[in-house]
Amino acid sequence: MEFSTKALDWSKAGQNGFLATKTDCLVVGLFEGQNLAGVAKALDVATKGLVGRLVKQGDFEGKRGTQLMLHEVAGVGAARVLLVGLGKEADFSDKAFADAVRTAVRALSSTRAASALWCLAQQAPQQRDVAWAVITTITLVREAGYRLLERHPGLKRANANGKPNGNDKSSLRKVVIAVDTGNARAATQAVVRGTAIANGMELTRDLGNLPSNICTPTYLANTARGIAKRHKLKAEVLGRKQIEALNMGAFLAVTKGSEEPPQFIVLRYDGAGAKQAPVVLVGKGITFDTGGISLKPGEGMDEMKYDMCGAASVLGTIQAVAEMGLKLNVIAVVPTCENMPSGIATKPGDVVTSMSGQTIEILNTDAEGRLILCDALTYVERFKPAAVIDVATLTGACIIALGHINSGLYARSDALADALLQAGRRAMDTAWRMPLDDEYQDQLKSNFADMGNIGGRPAGSVTAACFLSRFTEKYDWAHLDIAGTAWKSGAAKGATGRPVPLLAQFLMDRAA
């Protein structure tokens, strides 16, 4: 889908103005109430009071979540006019703006409209700028139009309606986002950034949604190489022998039961000078998690293909950073393998030595994400990072604590935590800061090693983060537990692309 911006003089709306633009659909937002303003007022004037009459007669009141499609409206160059309800202006929030975009996309998807002049961006919430509105519009429109089976048609020959794949996709191909003339430059940059973030989210969703017999550790490694080739990044992929040479005993313990070879992926984006310390993103890449010898229940186990969504989001984010051309250095690190049971798999009670030299009693083989991450967190010390953020579908306990709205955020540094929280709010990819008190560390005590890999049922997400914190003493570190936000179940089943928006916004803010 192609996005662009068009700077318009809203005072010139008539025969030679923006309302004369030839397009398949003109999208206009209306606040609830009879006081028309901005584009809505200009449209009302050009159509000789049509909008006002619709409002007065109660045919369209501008209530949030409502829309009205008009056809062949006199005085307008568009074949269709879509009125979108914005709700009460006093209550117009980020979420209300997002709801308006989604409402418009749903309405357009039921038509054959291939192009649209989108006049919602200048009606962003009061606290947001045009760049936010443009980026948000692009990511939401692309999110709504995402279809895995269009991108990987070999997975399924027909869609839910029995038609060949692609027959149910939206016709929309070109969206021109209208902005004020004074915001043209910022809006143009926002199109580049919004498109890059949307591309990163789609890559993340693809990798998460693909079945584990396709998206193997080797597939992830090849994907990383492809990103590097397209965007001129530096890629390094370590195999089992190199991982063994690094003494990554915790990572290797997880790999023992699988015949799929483990991979350790490093991608480098050098957008700033060599003297600038990089931001390192570490993503958990368990491409399928059976639980190992501590076997998971069969029900819902198919969703354990999503256990590599941390890795997917890290790859999606560094691709977005490269496409945006941000002036900072970013490194993505992905330890990836399967967690499988077998005759040689790691057993509960086994003790292993991590790359850091600390020993770990593996009390539960289903607490494997922290094992592959701890060696990766030790490995990244060599980069002397400005900050390290690890991303993982780490604990079911985080879902119990936070549900599916907020990702769990852990950090020792208030400054790093606040920057991530602020980025999440702006990107509408929110997180909630969780405790990391030293008192929780006692739950990880082991009689036979420096620590156990689990801390019991109480505060399970917290103790998992405490475990990781023991390997991050040499740099500023944050942990995102995305177990509740990386994918959805049920009718809307699929990867969400989170937390790419949060991470991308954090890096954009840092590069500013």
From Swiss-Prot:
Q: Where does Mn(2+) 1 bind?
A: 289, 366, 368
What PROSITE patterns would the database entry show?
A: CYTOSOL_AP (PS00631)
Gene Ontology cellular component annotations, sorted alphabetically: cytoplasm
**The enzyme's E.C. designation:** 3.4.11.1, 3.4.11.10
Q: What class of enzyme is it?
A: hydrolase
Q: Which residues form the active site?
A: 296, 370
Q: Which PANTHER family does the UniProt entry name for this protein?
A: CYTOSOL AMINOPEPTIDASE (PTHR11963:SF23), LEUCINE AMINOPEPTIDASE-RELATED (PTHR11963)
Q: Which reaction does it catalyse?
A: Release of an N-terminal amino acid, Xaa-|-Yaa-, in which Xaa is preferably Leu, but may be other amino acids including Pro although not Arg or Lys, and Yaa may be Pro. Amino acid amides and methyl esters are also readily hydrolyzed, but rates on arylamides are exceedingly low; Release of an N-terminal amino acid, preferentially leucine, but not glutamic or aspartic acids
Record's cofactor remark: Binds 2 manganese ions per subunit.
Give GO MF terms, alphabetically.
manganese ion binding; metalloaminopeptidase activity
Q: Which organism is it from?
A: Cupriavidus necator (strain ATCC 17699 / DSM 428 / KCTC 22496 / NCIMB 10442 / H16 / Stanier 337)
The biological processes this protein is annotated with in GO are:
proteolysis
Residues reported in the UniProt entry to bind Mn(2+) 2:
284, 289, 307, 368
Identify the domain of life.
Answer: Bacteria
Could you list this entry's UniProt keywords, alphabetically sorted: Aminopeptidase, Cytoplasm, Hydrolase, Manganese, Metal-binding, Protease
UniProt similarity note: Belongs to the peptidase M17 family.
Among InterPro entries, the record links this protein to: Leucine_aapep/pepB, Macro_dom-like, Peptidase_M17_C, Peptidase_M17_leu_NH2_pept, Peptidase_M17_N
Write the protein's name.
Probable cytosol aminopeptidase
